[in-house]
């Protein structure tokens, strides 16, 4: 019983904290709407990133903060000019989407930069530029993972597409629709087997890690947008663009390319 209580406190915060507002989260389940009530416990007040005295998006010059942005959730800087968080159900859905996209963006940013960085340091494994790597499947011989045909050898784009749809569709459908493996777990921060290092065991540290995850995730989403723009404008990967900028900052920067860029040329 004591062990169970300790584990429960690691995910809900310290005993005696004021419970926050109830949020209704609508979740699709194979075409049928399913509503679940979830009460969120306010994060540890010791953290400077939560509560009414948390940092705001413009610091002391921030305008009046909406009443529904109380600092209860990580990443809340009091900015909602468009009123996207006014509806509790929409707010809950948007928070879930932001966390998930943040995690994908962090993985994507690593995948866009790490292979190119390795190639710059002498590691050879075929095409390293992220937006060119996938096209190797159309080349003679197909696409070899890490340039090694003994690992994953892909020759059919249709097979890759079907595999992606089946595997990702199954996992995402299970996450959205729910299932026995997820019963009783927070859909965003499940813990347990998903936290093998026990990083969320301490509620104060857990509250800080939630903020760090969102801050880095937001940066990663902007980075991915920048990688797409760089690919369209320069036709180079992010590491090569960085090298070019360091070598000649005046000629290789966003302003220089924006003033000279002609679509289609």
From Swiss-Prot:
Chlorophyll b 3 binds at residues 156, 172. It is a multi-pass membrane protein. Chlorophyll a 1 binds at residues 79, 85, 98, 218. One of its GO terms (biological process) is photosynthesis, light harvesting. The LHC complex consists of chlorophyll a-b binding proteins. Residues 1-37 form a transit peptide. Photoregulated by reversible phosphorylation of its threonine residues. GO terms for molecular function: chlorophyll binding; metal ion binding. Its main location: plastid. It comes from the Eukaryota. One of its GO terms (cellular component) is photosystem I. Chlorophyll b 2 binds at residues 103, 152, 181. This is Chlorophyll a-b binding protein 215, chloroplastic. It comes from Pisum sativum (Garden pea). InterPro entries: Chloro_AB-bd_pln (IPR001344), Chloroa_b-bind (IPR022796). The gene is CAB215. Chlorophyll a 3 binds at residues 136, 146, 213.
């Amino acid at each position: 019983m004591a062990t169970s209580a300790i584990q429960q406190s690691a995910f809900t915060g310290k005993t005696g904290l004021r419970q926050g507002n109830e949020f209704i989260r609508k979740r699709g389940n194979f075409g049928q709407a399913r509503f679940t009530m979830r009460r969120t416990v306010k994060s540890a007040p010791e953290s400077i990133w939560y509560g009414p005295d948390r940092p705001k998006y413009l610091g002391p010059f921030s305008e009046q903060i909406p009443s529904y942005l109380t600092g209860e959730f990580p990443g809340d800087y009091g900015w909602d000019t468009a009123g996207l968080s006014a509806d509790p159900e929409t707010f809950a859905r948007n928070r879930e989407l932001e966390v998930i996209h943040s995690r994908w963006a962090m993985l994507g940013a690593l995948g866009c930069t790490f292979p190119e960085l390795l190639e710059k340091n002498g590691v050879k494994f075929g095409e390293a530029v992220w937006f060119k790597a996938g096209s190797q499947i159309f080349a003679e011989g197909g696409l070899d993972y890490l340039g090694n045909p003994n690992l994953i050898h892909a020759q059919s784009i249709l097979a890759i597409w079907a595999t992606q749809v089946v595997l990702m569709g199954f996992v995402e459908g299970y996450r959205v629709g729910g299932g026995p493996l997820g019963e009783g777990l927070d859909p965003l921060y499940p813990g347990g087997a998903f936290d093998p290092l026990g990083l969320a065991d301490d509620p104060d540290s857990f509250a800080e890690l939630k903020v760090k995850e969102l801050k880095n995730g937001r940066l990663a989403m902007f980075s991915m947008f920048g990688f797409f723009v760089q690919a369209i404008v320069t036709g180079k990967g992010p590491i090569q663009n960085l090298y070019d900028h360091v070598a000649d900052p005046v000629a290789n920067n966003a302003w220089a390319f924006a003033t000279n860029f002609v679509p289609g040329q």
